[in-house]
Structures are given as structure tokens and as C-alpha cells.
Amino acid sequence: MLAADGGKGTPRQIGIADADPGSISAAVWSPDSRQMAVLATSNHGTPALFDVSATGANVRRVALIPGAVHGPKFSPDGSRIALLYSSPSEESNGPTQATPRDTGAMDTHIDRQHLAIVDVAHGQMKVISKPDLYVYEFDWSPSGREFVVSSANGSGNNNWWVARLEAIDASRGAVREIAKPAMQIAQPLWSPDGREIAFIGGLMSDQGSTGGDLYTVPATGGAVHDVTPNIKVSLTTFRWRNAGSVLATMLSHGASEIGTVDAHTGALQPLWSVDESILSGRTRGIPEISATTDGSAVALVRESLATAPEVWAGPPGRLTQLTHANTGARPSWGKAVNVQWHNDQFNVQGFLIYPMNFDATKHYPMIVLIHGGPSAASGSSFIAENSEQAELSRDGYFVFMPNPRGSYGQGEAFTRANVKDFGHGDLRDIMAGVDAVIARYPVDGKRLGVTGWSYGGFMTMWTVTQTNRFRAAVAGAGISNWLSYTGENGISEWMVPFFGATAYEDPAVYAKSAPINYISHAHTPTLIIVGERDAECPAPQSFEFWRGLQHEGVTTELVVYPDEGHHFANPEHQRDVLRRDLAWFDKYLK
């Protein structure tokens, strides 16, 4: 762990002798900035909470906490640390991890996450939330007597989409409802004067991938108020500056922005914008910062498709680089450009990566890489050397990463534009982008491929049933049949906000977006990849599409990776996916 003094000094290392090497997962400042709460593991894997002085001279293990712990926050007086806690018997794999095999009686295990308080002086921990309540996020009230939480009853993996705002008494655990917004909610924060709760609300497909408008609600409960109903950006994080203003990060047409928002009028004052990604540890690709209490200074990691990540700090717009850890790192892929085009009523945006060793006298094949989500966005981040984009670029491909309607970056109306319309307007946006790229860059329009994972996998399956312009496709963890998917996946609550009803209540709205219903139109050679134990996009969805393509005489191959979930964890499997991906495109596009 490194610390630096306000952007002025050389970062210094702080060691925690009792922590397992490389195990630090969180570090937060106390209100007086004299100490930090640090989460790590100790004794070969047991989660532990440490109290560390700002200089690093004094380090004390406050508590060993068997189970899982996340998100520590000091109380306003610094005497207590609240955190999210699951006991060993209540822990569960997240929705993107490999799910346990479904055998025996179903629904007997309910994953739970509690709100707990640790006394800093004595190390005693007390769980204060109700046993049947899953707490996703929380914030202390300014008095330290209450918490605001986003929470839901039942298993946490499936119920984040229907979470509500509640207040929990910090001493007795009594619960009162503040609001039940008709959208997904993230980052509830109490105002400094204690009168309001602010949060980001919007259509969100995944916890942690945050984007939407700024909302407020009285701390005593009542109607929620959309403070920023017409902004053309997606708010991703914020913090209160004072009782009437917040400092926010935003995603805007592929750029990361910092600005202030009046918490009552919604007036937005931009402070800084950069065609890069900025982050501070939550979700890569979603702009986020760490900031002083008054918002006058920030700390963040800057990176782009051209520059490796480094830590910067200072007033927004006048940042100083603190680290030079990646000075020698250079992209192992071609240059990247921000591309914009018009379709229907939207100005759409995406990124285009050139082939490595580009020769302006040649035309190159292009792969369209569709992001997951759909509530997300492809951004300008320093991708891994062994990422799909880098490998394709080095192999002589343009890589086009569109952000069609349904993505973040252009306001909530744009994000909501694919509700009840999966695969239709978003595909039109993508194909208009393909045409725009072909018109402006040396792309061979007869050598196109398409790929994606999760929502991108669904879109790949959908695309090959709607157009024959692509000569090859690779569909990762896709969805082919919404009706059967409803009975197979472990997070079905996410579907209702996007389709307006369950598949049992309105099968028609799902049927019009199901690739399997248009399988007779498919002709594109398609490689299908999925994890054996994927709970988000279960393997049977890939089997259905594979069988359908076989029935239609389409060249296809299905590869199921053992013991993998939605996000593959085994490095050998990750490398094998890339190898097969490149070989498939090379076979049909080279």
C-alpha cells in the first residue's frame, strides 16, 4: 500500500506485517484523516480489519472476521467502522462466478449480506441489520445514529434490481422505509445537514456498473425527486460537497467528466473532461474518483487506449501525476479513435482500434466487438496485452466497439431506449456505425466479423439471425431463447425493468427479441463459447442456439468450459478462448 501527501510528495510504502502478502482489498480514511481502516486477510486467508495511522507508523489488527467483508466506512466520530458482512455459511458466489451445481432441494440456501459495526478500540463486531435483509450499500447519517441502506429481502444475487432505500438504527437495528424507487438504485449518501438522501437512479443491468440520474429523497421518507432529468450524460459516482451541491463523475460520449451538480435545481457545472478512463477502484470503465470532503481536490487513476494507468491528484483540471509505475508501458495494439455517427434520432458513439503495424495502402478486415450489460459502455482504457482487442489488432484486424442505444454516456433516455426493444434499435445503431466506419476508414466491408459476451453474446446470436453481412461470428455466454432462459438463470429479476413484465406475463415482448425464433435466417459460421456453470447466461442457452444452427446446416462449433461461470477464472481457459477466437476469424476472414 502506498500513500502520498496531497499530490506533493513521493509516494511512500506502508507495510502491514500481520496481513497476508498482496491481500489488501480496501482502505478508507477516518473523518480526521489521521488513520485508515484497511481490509486484508491474515492467518492465511481469514478476513481482517486493521487500524493504520496516516504515516504508517502504527498498525493494529482490530479484528479477525471469518466470512466475507466489504466496504468499510468510519462513523462520523471515528470510533466505529461499519462494513458489509456475510458469515461463512451465508457466503455465496457472485452471479458472475461459477455457480454450485443444482442438485438436491432448490432454494434451500439463501445468500445474505449484513450491515455490521466494529468498535475500533475493542474490536467487537455487532451485526445490526435484520437476518432476512440483504444489504447492498450503506452510508452513515451525519449524527452517527442511523444508516441509509439499499436492501432487499431474499437472496442478494437476484434481488438487487428491486432493492429499496431504508434507514437502520445504529444501536437497535430498527428499520424504517425511506423510499421504494421504480428504478435501480446505487450509492445512497446522506446529505451533510442530515435532511436528504441522494442516490444515482436509472436502468442498470448489473450491480457495480452504475449510470443514471441524480435523485434525492427526504431522509424522513417521501417522494423521490429526479434532480437531473434531462442531462445528456450518465452520472456514475458522486459525493456531497455541501448541503446543496455534489461533486460527480460522468460518462459523456466516451469521455470521462467531473463536475458539480446543484442538488436542488440540477444545474450542472463541468469542471474537467478527458478522453480517457478515470477510476479509483470500483468498476473499470465506469468513471470514479476519490475526493476531499469539500470536493476541492480529487485523486484518481487515469488511463486510455494510448496511455497506461497512473495515479493523479489535485483540483479537477489541475491534476499532478503522483506515480510513474508504468512509464515504460506502451500499447501492444494499434492506435484508437473515438468514432461518432447518426442513426434514427441518436448521435451514437464508439471506439475503433487500428490494426497493429497499419499500412495505409491496404484494406483490413474488421471485428465488431459488442460490450456486455447492456447498461455499460466500451471506453478508452489501457487494455490487457492478452485481451481480445489487443490480440485481434496484432492479428491484423480493425476492432470496432460501438456504444448503441441502451449504453451509458448520453443520458437516461438513451440508456432506456432499448426497453422492450432488445436487438432492434441497438442493432440498427451498430450497423449504421459499421457503415460509417467503412466509409471513413480502410475497412474491407466484405470481411466483417462480430463477437461479444453476455449481452454482447446475445447480440451476436441475434445479429447472425438478422443480417448476412458478417462472414464469421463468435458468441460468448449468449442468450438465445428468453422463455427458457427465464427458467434457467439465477438472476431473473433483471429482466422485468428491460422488458416491462416477466416472460410468463408477456411472452410476446420476449419472443420478438429471441434469436432462436429467427434461426432459419442464419447463415454465418458461428463459434459458441460458454462456461459450464454460468448462472447469468446458462449453458443450455448456447446449446439451443448451437442445435438450431446445426438444424439449419450452418457451420457451427460449441465449446463448454468445465467449472467456469459467467466470467472465466482459469487462465488456461482464458487463453484457449482467445486461441479459438482468433483461429475462427482467421479461417473465415483471411
Predicted regions and their residues:
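A flexible loop/linker signature enriched in serine peptidases of the S9 family
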Residues: 1, 17-24, 37-50, 64-70, ...
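N-terminal, post-signal-peptide region of Sec/Tat-exported proteins
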Residues: 1-13
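Short loop/turn segments that connect beta-strands within beta-propeller blades
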Residues: 4-7, 53-57, 119-123, 169-173, ...
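Beta-propeller fold detector
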Residues: 10-15, 60-63, 126-129, 176-179, ...
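Residue-level detector of Asp-centered blade-edge/turn motifs that repeat once per structural unit
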Residues: 31-32, 76-77, 142-143, 192-193, ...
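Hydrophobic beta-strand positions that form the internal "hydrophobic ladder"
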Residues: 33-37, 78-82, 147-148, 194-198, ...
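Serine-hydrolase catalytic core recognition
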Residues: 285-590
